[in-house]
Amino acid sequence: MTASKSTETLPGDNTNTWSGRFDEPVSELVQRYTASVGFDKRLAEYDIQGSLAHARMLAAGGIIGPHDLDAIERGLSQIRQEIQGGGFVWQLALEDVHLNIEKRLTALIGDAGKRLHTARSRNDQVATDIRLYLRASIDRITALIHAMQKALLHLAEQHVDTVMPGFTHLQVAQPIVFGHHLIAYFEMLKRDVERLADCRKRVNKLPLGAAALAGTSYSVDRAMVAQELGFEGVCENSLDAVSDRDFAIEFCAAAALIMTHLSRLSEELILWMSPPFGFIDLADRFCTGSSIMPQKKNPDVPELVRGKTGRVNGHLVALLTLMKAQPLAYNKDNQEDKEPLFDTVDTLTDTLRIYADMMAGIRVKETAMREAAKRGYATATDLADYLTKKGLPFREAHEAVAQAVRFAEKNNRDLSALTLPELQQFSPLIEDDIFTVLTLEGSLNSRNHIGGTAPVQVAAAIRRAREWLSATPAAQ
């Protein structure tokens, strides 16, 4: 939606909808302090959708007349066009998106505009707007996660046989294939998609009809409004309907996990791109240079993903803190829910958009990966397993191999480079067939089970992942 014009017009007379209760107008400072239109105007489209559904329900129930409905529909259509075209004038004095639209509607159609708010409060109105906004955001984000997953699978398919070291404690542990490593992130994002889908179920309930907190004395048809707006049902307690922000907190928690997964991948990209690793190179469009060191190519995008993850985590804590001491029902504190939520959506959306493209621009240095897998005695566990299969208790095999590693390290050689007599001094069970076991390919192929790093299993995992993507819609 195109950004609309913004003004900070502060009329001299008090034009608030609730001014009849007060002897003096709100001060200019308080108006600025309490206004939310600067950020909640992004809810305008959802506010219009909710108002149209509400008006149609009022007309169907005979609460407003058909001529009122026709005028409201025409007026809201014009307002939508003004907002999309950037010609709508937002007034700070009108406080929020709801009153700005209502005042403009009344100016366009007269008394019919004043009847729109019948059987409705801004409390249930804003709760509805946020849920509509978040539902649409979840669908867009889910589609972006799928794009990221496809990028991971595309890269993994190219590297089913590319050997690299697997790490624990950032120390070389065992050989794996690069495709296997990438699928680990696919699985993380798969859980993220499932969490978002589960969160969406709780987002997709209609608060409208709860009014301020106790419901309304009008005979409203909440089911009709829910059906028109695509909600699966209605919030069943009016107090909870207007005060609940669990769904926003739950989304932010899911978003924080997604960002955490991307941050972990970012850390690895940064490490892999550094000269001590030299496993990959990122496309130039995702990097910057140094103002003083001409040789530098800095992985700015992955670094910013790490940094922005802290930002999203902070928004989650902000929302939890916002809600922790509020009595029922609605309180003005809840105005502070929108900026953390909006920024979480924006940050996550931008991160996912850029990440899929960044994965497509990765150049893998296969030789460097393979050479690194040869270092650090990555096949030591295979030697221990070999001895165990020969009948030696695993703990004894572990000790024998540890001594063999010390010997090899002292002589600056890999286990596979030791002679048979040298190996047999640590266990007489070792025979000629050990040298097949100690190769990188031998180690990889021995992990031939679901979830293992054997190339044949990695290829099967990629097929299963593509089947899951095909069966999982991006939008519910």
Swiss-Prot record:
GO molecular function, one term: argininosuccinate lyase activity
Top enzyme category: lyase
Reaction it catalyzes: 2-(N(omega)-L-arginino)succinate = fumarate + L-arginine
Coarse class of the protein's main subcellular location: cytoplasm
Keywords: Amino-acid biosynthesis, Arginine biosynthesis, Cytoplasm, Lyase
GO CC term (a single one): cytosol
Pathway: Amino-acid biosynthesis; L-arginine biosynthesis; L-arginine from L-ornithine and carbamoyl phosphate: step 3/3
Name of a matching Pfam family: Lyase_1
Subcellular location: Cytoplasm
Enzyme nomenclature, EC number: 4.3.2.1
GO BP annotation list: arginine biosynthetic process via ornithine; L-arginine biosynthetic process
Family of the protein in this entry: Belongs to the lyase 1 family. Argininosuccinate lyase subfamily.
PANTHER family: ARGININOSUCCINATE LYASE
Designated name of the protein: Argininosuccinate lyase
Source organism of the structure: Nitrosospira multiformis (strain ATCC 25196 / NCIMB 11849 / C 71)
Source lineage: Bacteria, Pseudomonadati, Pseudomonadota, Betaproteobacteria, Nitrosomonadales
Gene name, Swiss-Prot/TrEMBL: argH
